[in-house]
Each structure stands twice: as C-alpha cells, then as structure tokens.
Amino acid sequence: MISIVTPVYNEDGNVVYFHDEVTKVMQTLDMDYEIIYVNDGSKDRTDELIHQLAAGDPHVRALTFARNFGHQIAITCGMDFAVGDAVITMDGDMQHPPALIPKLIQKWQEGYDIVQTKRTATEDAGPIKKLTSAGYYAVINSISNSPVVPGGSDFRLMDRKALDAFLRFREHSRFIRGIVGGLGFKQCTIEFEAPARHAGVSKFSMKKMLHFAMDGIITNSTLPLRVAFYLGVLAAVAGILLILHVLYCVMMDEAVPGWATMTILIAIFGSLNLMGLGIIGEYLGRMFEETRNRPLYWLSDDTAAHLDNPYRVSHKKV
C-alpha cells in the first residue's frame, strides 16, 4: 500500500482538484493506496471539503487539528497515521505535481528507501526568492552535518523502515528536510519543475519563512553559538588593541581619542553582547519547549475514528 500525506491550510480552492488529480494517477497504478489529509487549523471550507472527500471515497482519511500547529507538524501527523509500505508527502496546492508520483514509486521499487525531489524551477517564484533560497541552502549545508538537497521540498517518498526511523524524532522545532537528510538509508533525488498554484496564494508568509529558516539552522547546527563566541573573541582583541593605543598615546604625550570613539565602541560591543544573548536565547527557548514534553499536536476530529494515536482528543474537549 502507498500512503499519500497532504497537509492543508486554507486550501478550499485547491483540495478537491488536487484530490481528483491524485486519484486519477493512483487509479492507473496496480496498487492499493490511502490519502491522508491533515487540516492544519484552516479558517475556510477546507475541513468541510476533506470530510466530504472522506465520506465519498474509502481511500481518504481526514484528520483535523484542534488548532494550527504548522506545516512540519502536520506532515508528521499524517506520517504517524499512515499504514502504507511507503509514504509520499506532498502539498495540496498542485505545486507538487501528482504526475510525478509514478516516478517516485518506480525509484522505490528499484530499491531506494528515500526518494527526494528537487525544484529546478518554480513558475511563481521571483528572482529575489530564488536568490535567497540558494543562499540559504548554501549556508545550511556548510554548517550542518545533515545534508539538505538545495532546492529541495517536502515532496518525497519514504519506505516504511525509513519512516519508522523518522518517527522516532519527536522534537517540536523540526526541519524535516534536515532530519530526512541525516537519516541515511539509500536515497536518490528526482528533479521537477514546480508549476504555479492551481488557485489562491501561498499561506507561507514572510514571518513563517523566517521561522522555518531559523528552525533549519538552529536544529541542524550549533555553529551560531560558536559564531557568537568568535565575535566575542574579536571584540576582546579589538578592546585590547584600543587599550594599547591609549597607552601609546599617553606615553607619547598625545591626545587620547575622545568620547566619539568610545561611544562607537561601546555601541558595537553592546550590540555583539545582545546578539550573543539572542542566539543563546533561541537555543535555550527550544530546549525549554522540548523539556516540557508536550505532545506535538492533538486532533479535534478523525474520520476513521480510530483511537490508535495518543495525541487524539475527543471533539467535545476542544
């Protein structure tokens, strides 16, 4: 069986069309399948639509979060419930083309445990987004021990044994591309051109993108902490040089630099201190979240009504 996991957030203009396209593709394959939709706290008719799909198609299971938990947690939730021998994760806005599913399955049947995808082009991505994306992946791959496919996406196939290994990672601040890259197993990458969204606009705001980028760096590397240390060393060296310069001026009976220089240096050193504290705070904040050991998510509804997940809560309690 193939499990297809699709997180949806305010996608009432896409989800039915997406479902029809995925169903057409899966019906051409001689394989049993399930489609799991995870509603990540949508405010539109998305929840109503996925419940209608579940009522009319026995292959569909609709899971509804009690509130918004985020894209990465929604993917993880769908994986928790998936029962397939392989699981395909993909977005429901048609930028992950369903036509590529047979190729993912083919690579899996050839013996690959994880089949990644890489966007070679995105129709609705501007030059600034492309440049910042390329720079981000260059940075994260230079500082992380877990390789991340440049231009990669969360459109991938994972074999059951790779999925079971992935599901042992339960951190709240998660960057799935980094986790999957560090799993090992036999992996390959398929390139594709991402079409424009079928309808609507991206729900991935600038704030969410920055948070996603920060999670990718902090959860995959401790280099920012070392950078803060190195900057502190440089600041200390600069301070020593300034002291030597002042002593030289005193010995040579020259005028000691005035308040402007001192004010600038104090501002610089103060900024470095605050930056270092901010970096440490990011790590400590994430550590605090993990030590509370709260569930990754909880559900308000599950159309399969199976009590097979510890995070499910009754609809009345939400």
Place the predicted regions along the sequence by residue.
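Short aromatic/hydrophobic "clamp" motif used to bind/position activated sugar donors
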Residues: V87
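Acidic helix N-cap motif at the loop->helix transition within catalytic regions
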Residues: N14-Y17, D44-L53
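Acceptor/aglycone-binding surface of glycosyltransferases and processive sugar-polymer synthases
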Residues: Q52, H59-R67, H71-F81, P98-I179, ...
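A conserved acidic beta->alpha catalytic loop
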Residues: N39-D47, M94-Q95
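Short beta-strand/loop segment that forms part of the nucleotide-sugar
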Residues: M31-G41, L63-T64
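Hydrophobic helical membrane-anchoring modules
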Residues: F175-V318
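Short, well-formed alpha-helical segments that are part of the catalytic scaffolds
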Residues: E11-M26
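Cell-envelope/extracellular polymer assembly enzymes that use nucleotide-activated donors
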Residues: M1-S3, E34
